[in-house]
Amino acid sequence: MPKSIFSFFSGVGLLDLGFDTAGYDIVFVNEFKEEFLKAYRFARQNRIADPIYGYHRCSIDDFFTCSYNAFLQHSIHLERNSGNIIGFVGGPPCPDFSVAGKNRGRNGENGILAQSYVNLITQFLPDFFVFENVKGLVKTERHRIYFDELKQQLQTAGYYISDQVLNSLSFGVPQDRDRIILVGIHRDFYGRNQHAVPENNLQFPWLQHALFGNAEEIKAEDWETTDPFHENSNRYFPRQTPNRYRELCVETWFRRNNVDNHPNANDVFRVKQGLHKMQTIPEGDVSGKSFKRLHRWRYSPTAAYGNNEVHLHPYRVRRLSVAEAMAIQSIPAWFTLPTNMTLSNKFKVIGNGVPVLMATAIAQTLSELLDEIVAN
């Protein structure tokens, strides 16, 4: 059965891109920031069809008001009448739950949006949903209490749920990035197939489409640590690192995406201060709070480019370009951001997104589970 996605907090659509790659139809897109929404449309032009119910620049809370509410309800009704499976996907803004962010929790201006998203799900009752956020939502005790309350609300509304902290390394992304993913399937979706209804929580095979195993085992391998920095130097893939992990290396993705010739190759912040430091930090030294130099034959730290964190190119005297940051997020080479988008917003929207390979794997696993329920 066709699967229709209603996307919220879409950003530039990296989570959506994963679902699109896995065969879902993105039919509705909602993003509050105008520049992000314009970039979403720009990146997909001539390659992916526009959502049939349009792009909506508004707050998620607007969907509880008359006109927006009626339009969303009508759109869902049309999809149901077409026999399509309905899904909501979204990652509410996460600075209020991030250890590196404001950490204000449920009462922060972003933190309250997690509640709004859950309220939307429990009002419109899609067949399934995906909720994505930073691991701080479950690793910090007071945030975990809030998360448990949200899950209880979803269960009361009839959803069988499963959540897991996942690391993007497991899915072939050249980046050490943890995210909490929560998925749910509504009890009504099971219909007559009552023997498939979970006894308690949804049994979701989180690593079914993972390219590699446990991320901690990956990180425990014999990776390159640091090497003296030499501008434009050549270094071969190290013998001690298993060859299968070449896929997780920054340099592999730089070459795959041909980042030097990418339309966003010249989108780079020029450093006005700290040039000497950039010339002396060893390749692979990511121990600093601010300046971190990536190693070409290792994975990147989390692609978070705010809070004074500066990621340096492995063998050039500069920061990473937008094209390179996109490669580290496993974004395909054809994906580009518009020239008139501010550089700050380009890095922000990339860093906020879900790595595409990770999103694709989750979408594939969910699709197979939904198909299995329908088939039985």
Provide a role label for each language-model segment:
Residues 85, 177-179, 298-300:
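Extracellular structured ligand-interaction cores
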Residues 26, 128, 301-302:
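Beta-sheet entry/capping signal
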Residues 13, 34-35, 93-95, 135-136, ...:
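Short, solvent-exposed loop/turn segments at secondary-structure junctions
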Residues 88, 182, 351:
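Short, conserved catalytic/metal-binding motifs centered on acidic residues
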Residues 240-376:
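C-terminal target-recognition/interaction regions appended to catalytic cores
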Residues 90, 131, 305:
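Redox-cofactor binding/interface segments in oxidoreductases and associated redox assembly factors
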